[in-house]
Amino acid sequence: MVSRRVQALLEQLRAQGIRDEQVLDALAAVPREKFIDEAFEHKAWENIALPIGQGQTISQPYMVARMTELLELTPQSRVLEIGTGSGYQTAILAHLVHHVCSVERIKGLQWQARRRLKQLDLHNVSTRHGDGWQGWQARAPFDAIIVTAAPPEIPTALMAQLDEGGILVLPVGDEQQFLKRVRRRGGEFIIDTVEAVRFVPLVRGELA
């Protein structure tokens, strides 16, 4: 049974244009309050981004739903997430596909996310501590890649790791950022601009 707060959020997301009911079902199934600090639990089902420490945030539910919807996932999709963060977006993906690969540059966040996912019995996720700019070459190619922080330009390594017909969704820019969708068609990459957004920057390298 979906709580009143969750139902209200889902209706808000529908009003904002989210149409994929499977994505909405995944949002309803994942307890967002488990991925944030106790001090913010009362705001868990509000449509806002929240801090998770280390200068990072958990994205607002609308943006999670929008980016996930743009990936056009099927259960068989091979998915790479860049920026595990709290693990919330990872959990949404894990409800929609058979397996998710996720890369996080901050070791502490990776550990916390793995613990949360395990507590929720989400075992179809592989996480890695590493530089998100480089993707996860050993697991490539991917049908879908989602990036939860903004590089100033689209990383070429991520485009190279897309399979034929694959989709990359990411925010791009410095002061001014736009959500982009990149689709691979043979040797070409078709890039569409979706909407203006605001994300933390995608930093190169990794932190212990």
UniProtKB/Swiss-Prot annotation:
UniProt xrefs under InterPro entries: PCMT (IPR000682), SAM-dependent_MTases_sf (IPR029063)
SUPFAM superfamilies found in the cross-reference section: S-adenosyl-L-methionine-dependent methyltransferases
Entry's EC annotation: 2.1.1.77
Root EC class: transferase
Entry GO MF terms: protein-L-isoaspartate (D-aspartate) O-methyltransferase activity
Catalytic activity: [protein]-L-isoaspartate + S-adenosyl-L-methionine = [protein]-L-isoaspartate alpha-methyl ester + S-adenosyl-L-homocysteine
Keyword Zinc: no
Active-site residues, as the UniProt record annotates them: S59
GO cellular component: cytoplasm
BP GO annotations: methylation; protein modification process; protein repair
Compartment(s) where it occurs, according to its Swiss-Prot or TrEMBL record: Cytoplasm
Keyword set, alphabetical order: Cytoplasm, Methyltransferase, S-adenosyl-L-methionine, Transferase
Job description of the protein: Catalyzes the methyl esterification of L-isoaspartyl residues in peptides and proteins that result from spontaneous decomposition of normal L-aspartyl and L-asparaginyl residues. It plays a role in the repair and/or degradation of damaged proteins.
Family the entry assigns: Belongs to the methyltransferase superfamily. L-isoaspartyl/D-aspartyl protein methyltransferase family.
PANTHER family: PROTEIN-L-ISOASPARTATE O-METHYLTRANSFERASE, PROTEIN-L-ISOASPARTATE(D-ASPARTATE) O-METHYLTRANSFERASE
Identification of the protein by name: Protein-L-isoaspartate O-methyltransferase
Gene symbol of the encoding locus: pcm
